[in-house]
Regions:
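Catalytic-core region of carbohydrate-active enzymes that cleave or remodel glycosidic bonds
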Residues: 302-373
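Active-site mouth of glycoside hydrolases
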Residues: 36-39, 43-307
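Aromatic- and carboxylate-lined catalytic core of secreted/periplasmic carbohydrate-active enzymes
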Residues: 346-472, 483-498
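N-terminal signal peptide c-region/cleavage motif recognized by signal peptidases
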Residues: 24-25
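Bacterial N-terminal signal peptides that target proteins for export
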Residues: 2-19
């Protein structure tokens, strides 16, 4: 560990001068990025990719009791290609949000933060207080080991630097709480932690220092992108919209669409600028994600961090992708939940979102817990779902999308002229291929604006990916009629020119 001489700003300079040559991972291929031919999808290791996963509650590194190798083995086995991770600037108490077994709530004295422990007792979660002028080598080693192991297994990692505080229980455990660090940095209100102009400039310098430190140390990983903050609207929001106008209490969750306040957006822009500034002196450039709102909202420039290539919604509706297509960024559904625990609920959400043009889907999977890192704790009480069966069903979506030339696929709402009894979402590579998701009462007969020629159509089970029906089509003029097989609730359809 390296002792800093004065401010947190010096942290970045000192660590940059002394540690970068030792701790950086070996340089690999270019990091995951927006696809150069279609910025609404991603490109990784030379291929267009959609990130689709059902992953744990972001505590794999900060919770040292969690066996992350077993966890990554389960993700790889189930065909998941992505996981989300909190950097350790936020931790939860046991029982938070009604989660019985929470990977983001480590046992007492076990919280592994990015800062070193001091020699002074008194951290509210057990053990010594944090020294915000020193970074923890144990944390950094575990973080790098996790990202490297994920990369070997073909899994992309989203690292979220900061998180809203939500309430006094979380604040009691927060490393930035003056009672939990030896610097005793004064914080007038935890709600102002992630806002500009900074009400606590010293603390803002520590936030910048952590950001720059992790950006430097992780620069060599290709399976990594950064997210500035989780759910910034939770602590600082403006009312954006509501979902159902017929509810009497339309301005409460889960009907209210809360968007991030301008003061919080300004803070996120400052953190994003620190990321790009730091990487401007380093070999690699990593994508930045911005978490903007829950549910759905049409965004404008004032809502956005200019450096962000990925825009995240939580509990998202398909309209989140549809309404923001013109931004030319990847639109992600970054967290599910609060809709029960049935697999079919989150399977439907995933299909509807990605088939509306969303490039990323992350089901928050509560079946991953300490001791059940294989994702089999389906009895865990939590505000969401997750199971091995759901992960297999989500793999079917990825397999379906990646059978096409993904970078050429675009939402095509006019391709389906008529769809009795069902709702259809279509992605098209015009003149070459069409991918459809059909949900509703089957069987049905679709009327399609299919170009003249010979085509192969395959109706595919959304549960396990097997082909329900295959036929050759000779299209003479549009619209062409195509009859489905019997199906229960939903079916996928691939149409490819012969």
């Amino acid at each position: 560990m390296i002792r800093l001489k004065s401010s947190a700003l010096q942290t970045t300079r000192l660590l940059g001068a002394t540690c970068i040559c030792v701790l950086l991972p070996p340089l690999t291929a270019a990091p995951i990025r927006q696809h150069p031919d279609n910025p609404r999808w991603l490109e990784w290791r030379g291929k267009a990719v959609a990130l689709i996963t059902s992953a744990e509650h972001y505590g794999t590194v900060l919770n040292p009791d969690f066996d992350f190798r077993r966890y990554l083995e389960a993700l790889q086995r189930d065909g998941m290609n992505y996981t989300r991770l909190f950097a350790g600037s936020y931790v939860e108490p046991q029982g938070a949000f009604g989660i019985e077994r929470n990977t983001l709530a480590p046992a007492r004295r076990k919280f592994l933060a990015p800062w070193a422990r001091s020699d002074q007792p008194g951290y509210a979660g057990g053990g010594n207080k944090f020294d915000l002028d020193r970074f923890s080598p144990e944390y950094l080693a575990r973080l790098k080991e996790f990202i490297a192991e994920a990369g070997r297994r073909g899994i992309v990692v989203e690292l979220t630097f900061f998180c809203s505080t939500y309430g006094d229980q979380q604040w009691a455990l927060h490393p930035f709480n003056s009672t939990n660090n030896i610097q005793a940095v004064a914080v007038p209100s935890w709600k102002s932690l992630h806002t500009l102009p900074a009400r606590q400039p010293v603390l803002f310098n520590y936030q910048l220092a952590l950001t720059r430190h992790l950006v430097r140390e992780l620069n060599g990983f290709d399976n990594l992108f950064f997210e500035v903050q989780n759910e910034p609207w939770a602590d600082n929001h403006a009312m954006g919209d509501f979902i159902n106008p017929y509810l009497s209490d339309k301005y409460s969750f889960p009907n209210a669409v809360e968007v991030t306040s301008p003061e919080s957006v300004a803070w996120q822009r400052a953190i994003a600028k620190a990321i790009t500034d730091e990487e401007g002196r380093l070999p690699q450039r990593h994508l930045i994600a911005q978490n903007v709102a829950n549910f759905r909202f049409s965004l404008n420039d004032g809502d956005l961090v200019p450096e962000a290539g990925i825009i995240h919604f939580h509990y998202a509706y398909p309209e989140a992708a549809e309404w923001n297509r013109g931004l030319n960024r990847v639109i992600g559904y970054d967290e599910t939940g609060f809709a029960g625990n049935k697999d079919e609920t989150y399977r439907r959400q995933a299909w509807n979102f990605v088939m509306s043009g969303g490039g990323l889907f992350n089901n928050l999977d509560y079946s991953f817990t300490t001791g059940h890192e294989d994702g089999t704790d389906t009895a865990n009480k939590a505000p969401g779902g997750g199971s091995p069966a759901l992960r297999r069903q989500l793999k079917t979506i990825g397999d379906f999308l990646h059978r096409f030339d993904l970078a050429r696929l675009q939402p095509d709402p006019l391709f389906v002229a008529r769809a009795p009894g069902v709702v259809v979402r279509a992605l098209s590579h015009p003149g070459k291929a069409h991918a459809l998701y059909v949900q509703g009462r089957g069987p049905t007969t679709l009327s399609l604006q299919l170009a003249k020629g010979r085509w192969t159509a395959e109706w595919i089970s959304v549960e396990d990916g097997h082909v329900l029906k295959r036929e050759n089509i000779s299209a003479e003029k549009a619209p062409a009629a195509l009859a489905s097989p019997e199906f229960n609730d939903a079916v996928a359809l691939s149409i490819v020119r012969q």
